[in-house]
Amino acid sequence: MRRAALALALSVALAGCGLDVQSADLFLLTRSGQGKQLTLLVNDSGTIRCNGGKVRPLSDPLLLQARDLASTLDADVVSKLRFATSANSVFTYAVRLPDGTLRFPDTAGAHHTEIAQAEQFALQAAQQACGLSG
């Protein structure tokens, strides 16, 4: 009986310690090409780091979109989806995920919905969460 009470007290004490457990990064998106390079480090806790700056909050809709993108794009990495470079592209994207990195030109979104969604996420996150022009 005494051991059970001690175990219970210990587990309650540990639960209240506020262990500093950090959420995993969902992905690192880099956009390069004309204009300034953009980097977005998206964390599962609902934060984003823009161009190596300070951590900023990410809105719930953007966080849900980022989680969905991470899952979808990671499946593309696993299936070894590749894109040819295009002379018509303005930007090139690289998305680093747990299973590897997916690289694509901005023209790839015309044929792949998830790629168009990644490009849209980059624009919305840059404007809304980072306060950048996009």
Predicted regions and their residues:
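Bacterial N-terminal signal peptides that target proteins for export
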Residues: 1-6
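Short, well-ordered, aromatic-rich surface patches in folded extracellular/luminal domains
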Residues: 18-28, 77-134
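Residue-level detector of buried hydrophobic side-chain packing
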Residues: 42, 66, 93-95
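C-terminal motif of bacterial Sec signal peptides marking the signal peptidase cleavage site
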Residues: 13-16
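Short, surface-exposed coil-to-beta transition loops
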Residues: 33-39, 88-90
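Mature extracytoplasmic domains of secretory-pathway proteins
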Residues: 54-85
